[in-house]
């Protein structure tokens, strides 16, 4: 009986393998010139789910396009329960494709990779599980044309960068204006990836490299994980890719005519996929193929890089696990967190850059000099990459944050990100550190539906504040500590304050009629000699103020008991003892 069961199992696996070998992709059918439509992508993955026990297709959250995200789970034993996967000591690699559907290389490379896995043409180790989003920006994928990305070499047709709200989803991970981003956050916390990959295509200079790599900034990732990323993980990928026939180069973050002079490493703040992943102590990578290379070369390079990531993760599974576990524990007890970094141009690493000589020639459009790269003049040169970003500013960790329940949009995002918090059970007075926004700058041009606040200056003071039943108490003893710091501290680059979630405090809601307040102000000054002294001193030191009656009246109002306390008071409070 046992022999019969084994024979049946072998026959079942053989049938699956033969069947999967017969599944070709639109990319292959077109000989590397086409990428599938959204519906072809989903139908293809459904067939893989049906024909292989290694592949499970899950339906996840809804997007702005009216279609749900899907998640493909690939494992040798067919397990798609992520709690079990973690208990069984397996590393999880989350691969995101089609965030910019005009850059579909990862869509096709992932299909080829998984088809080869189930056909036993490429074997993944038992200690690795792949979680793949087949296409993230569904709205952009549906908006298909041959005319977008005029300077990209294939495929024949592809999707659009913006989603159904015309948002760039690779700027939406913190602010989460889209349903797409919210569905992604659910996937991210479901999978809890050890390694995250977000497949892209680059723009910018012309050079010989097919694949460039944007690695999450190692100083920002920080600690032993950052050191391991910089000294072990990333160099191993470069070595592996060279063995596979591809010379990697850091993402070419240069938009002049001489990239051979070097460039600063791309700064991936938390608005970006890789920066968001770093907040959760995940090794994050953004492969960027070169737009001018033929499509089939770009897909093959993406395939090879995903193989390299899988192979390193499998080989170094225990080291990755240990580093992440140690980091998660240390972040719970850390006493301060960085909120800004600055580029150090005195430090760099050297890489071999394979470029083309650039020059100027008359433009046939304007007649003026224009840049061009001469592919008949390739060169190789060792160049500097400025990849050190030391901490510029840090904040001491509070015992907890408290957010009044009225700021429910922020509360929703914290809950979405699995932040641990409790609602106050009764009205209570708590001594807290409160911030007042002293100054800030707002961008004049809109950026992804927002006018970003920056250069924020604050004044902190200890106050007793009355909180109501239902306000939210957020303890700072959790894995989410870094996420909380970089979203709730107003001076952080991608804080919720920066993204305008608290802009209502920046405008006064009450005022006065000058003629009516004049007599009230005069009486108030008679009874408040300290304020009268301050007013007189201001007149002596500020000539324009001394000549402006309205400004002086407003000075009295702003320093009186009638001035609204909510104006410029940041509504996220810090419990400090």
Can you say where each PLM-predicted feature lies in the sequence?
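Bacterial Sec-dependent N-terminal signal peptides
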Residues: 1-24
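Accessory, solvent-exposed terminal regions and/or long lumenal/extracellular loops of proteins
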Residues: 480-482, 491-577
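Second-shell loop/turn segments in exported
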Residues: 28-35, 99-103, 170-174, 223-227, ...
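Active-site/substrate-binding loop(s) of hydrolase catalytic cores
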Residues: 86-99, 104-258, 265-268
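Feature captures C-terminal
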Residues: 362-499, 503-522
């Amino acid at each position: 009986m046992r022999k019969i069961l084994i024979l049946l199992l072998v026959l079942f696996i053989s049938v699956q393998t033969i069947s999967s070998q017969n599944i070709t992709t639109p990319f292959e059918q077109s000989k590397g010139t086409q990428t599938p439509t959204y519906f072809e992508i989903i139908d293809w993955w459904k067939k893989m789910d049906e024909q292989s026990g290694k592949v499970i297709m899950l339906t996840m959250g809804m997007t702005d396009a009216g279609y749900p995200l899907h998640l493909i789970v690939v494992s040798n034993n067919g397990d798609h329960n992520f709690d079990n996967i973690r208990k069984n000591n397996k590393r999880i690699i989350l691969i995101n494709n089609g965030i910019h559907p005009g850059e579909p290389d990862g869509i096709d490379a992932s299909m080829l990779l998984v088809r080869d896995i189930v056909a036993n043409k490429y074997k993944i180790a038992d200690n690795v599980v792949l979680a793949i989003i087949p296409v993230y920006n569904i709205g952009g994928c549906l908006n298909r044309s041959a005319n977008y990305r005029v300077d990209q070499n294939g495929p024949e047709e592809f999707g659009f960068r913006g989603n159904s709200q015309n948002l760039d989803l690779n700027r939406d991970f913190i602010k989460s204006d889209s349903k797409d981003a919210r569905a992604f956050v659910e996937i991210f916390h479901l999978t809890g990836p050890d390694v995250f990959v977000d497949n892209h295509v680059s723009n910018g200079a012309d050079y010989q490299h097919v694949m460039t790599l944007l690695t999450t900034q190692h100083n920002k990732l920080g600690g032993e994980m950052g050191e391991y990323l910089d000294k072990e993980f990333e160099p191993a990928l470069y070595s592996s890719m060279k063995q596979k026939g591809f010379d990697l180069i850091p993402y070419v973050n240069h938009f002049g005519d001489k990239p051979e002079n070097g460039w600063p490493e791309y700064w991936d703040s938390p608005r970006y996929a890789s920066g968001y992943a770093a907040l959760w102590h995940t090794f994050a990578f953004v492969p960027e193929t070169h737009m001018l290379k033929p499509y089939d070369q770009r897909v093959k390079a993406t395939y090879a890089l995903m193989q390299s990531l899988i192979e390193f993760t499998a080989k170094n599974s225990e080291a990755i696990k240990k580093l992440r576990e140690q980091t998660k524990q240390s972040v719970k007890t850390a006493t301060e967190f960085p909120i800004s970094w600055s580029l150090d141009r005195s430090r760099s690493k050297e890489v071999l850059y394979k470029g083309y000589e650039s020059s100027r020639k008359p433009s046939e459009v304007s007649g003026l000099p224009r840049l061009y790269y001469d592919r008949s003049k390739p060169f190789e040169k060792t160049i500097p990459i400025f990849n050190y970003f030391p901490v510029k500013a840090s904040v001491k960790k509070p015992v907890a944050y408290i957010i009044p329940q009225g700021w429910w949009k922020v509360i929703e995002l914290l809950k979405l990100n699995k932040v641990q918090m409790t609602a106050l059970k009764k009205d209570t007075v708590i001594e807290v550190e409160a911030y007042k926004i002293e100054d800030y700058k707002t961008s004049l041009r809109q950026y992804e539906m927002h006018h970003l606040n920056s250069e924020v200056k604050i004044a902190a003071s200890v106050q007793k504040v009355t909180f109501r039943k239902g306000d939210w108490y957020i303890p700072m003893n959790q894995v989410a500590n870094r996420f909380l710091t970089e979203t709730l501290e107003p001076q952080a680059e991608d804080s919720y304050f920066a993204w305008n979630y608290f802009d209502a405090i920046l405008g006064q809601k009450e005022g006065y009629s000058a003629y009516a307040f004049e007599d009230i102000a005069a009486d108030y000054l008679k009874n408040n000699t300290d304020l009268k002294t301050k007013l007189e001193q201001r007149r002596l030191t500020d000539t324009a103020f001394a000549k402006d009656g309205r400004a002086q009246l407003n000075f009295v109002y702003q320093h009186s008991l009638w001035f609204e306390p909510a104006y410029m008071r940041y509504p996220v409070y810090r419990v400090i003892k």
